[in-house]
Amino acid sequence: MEDLDHEYKNYWETTMFFQNQELEFDSWPMEEAFSGSGESSSPDGAATSPASSKNVVSERNRRQKLNQRLFALRSVVPNISKLDKASVIKDSIDYMQELIDQEKTLEAEIRELESRSTLLENPVRDYDCNFAETHLQDFSDNNDMRSKKFKQMDYSTRVQHYPIEVLEMKVTWMGEKTVVVCITCSKKRETMVQLCKVLESLNLNILTTNFSSFTSRLSTTLFLQVTLSLSPSLISLFGNVITSTNYKILNASREYCTCLVLV
């Protein structure tokens, strides 16, 4: 019975000791602050009180700065799981790692875009220099052969002649010296050029010329200045120069109008 009382007494004293130590550890800044504010009875108290109060103030300032930085960090990080210090720091580290990964991804995309733009500006050749020189030499040889072939060709085969297909030709006298010639022909390649050459070859005094182009026809109206002595041979002159096709001359009027229609 005495042993049990002794052990219970020791247990009680040990528990009280740890409780007292915890209270002293938690309340030492306040005790030092209060002890520094008053006068000390010991001769060393005057020297230790200002130092203790200075330490308390510096510790308070340090914790205040730390809390301010944590608040600023909490406002920057978008995802905060908890509001304690450890969670804020952990979430900040995770967010920084996420930003680093995004930076690497963007840099890779930028490099890929730059490489594509370089390929578009300067395309890469799949053959070496020797193959390129050989290819260029063959190309130049082929061009020389083609030019020789073109030189050997006859001029008549290169410049084709497109005859004028006259559909209707009408000659009308307007007075004694003025004649109106209306020519209607089918519209083909170089028809207008050939017709102009024909008119120039006649060596007639042309006052005015009017060309009208349609989908499949080309109409030309000429105002000529001629003499009456030329009137019998005017139609035959046009017929022989324009084309070698046989025409049938229809006299609508003996003195004023003569029509030439293609047979």
From Swiss-Prot:
Location of region: Disordered: 32-61
Subcellular location: Nucleus
Listed Pfam families: bHLH-TF_ACT-like_plant (PF22754), HLH (PF00010)
Residue ranges annotated for the bHLH domain, each copy included: 50-99
Record CDD domains: bHLH_AtFIT_like
Tissue specificity note: Expressed constitutively in roots, leaves, stems, and flowers.
Keywords on record: DNA-binding, Nucleus, Transcription, Transcription regulation
GO molecular function list: DNA binding; DNA-binding transcription factor activity; protein dimerization activity
Biased composition (Low complexity): 32-47
InterPro entries: bHLH-TF_ACT-like_plant, bHLH_dom, HLH_DNA-bd_sf, TF_AMS/ICE1/BHLH6-like
GO biological processes: regulation of DNA-templated transcription
Compositional bias ranges of the Polar residues kind: 49-58
SUPFAM superfamilies for this protein: HLH, helix-loop-helix DNA-binding domain
One GO term describing the cellular component: nucleus
Highest taxon of source: Eukaryota
Chief localisation class: nucleus
PANTHER family: TRANSCRIPTION FACTOR BHLH27 (PTHR31945:SF84), TRANSCRIPTION FACTOR SCREAM2-RELATED (PTHR31945)
Quaternary assembly: Homodimer.
Protein's name in the database: Transcription factor bHLH27
Species this chain originates from: Arabidopsis thaliana
Lineage, highest ranks first: Eukaryota, Viridiplantae, Streptophyta, Embryophyta, Tracheophyta
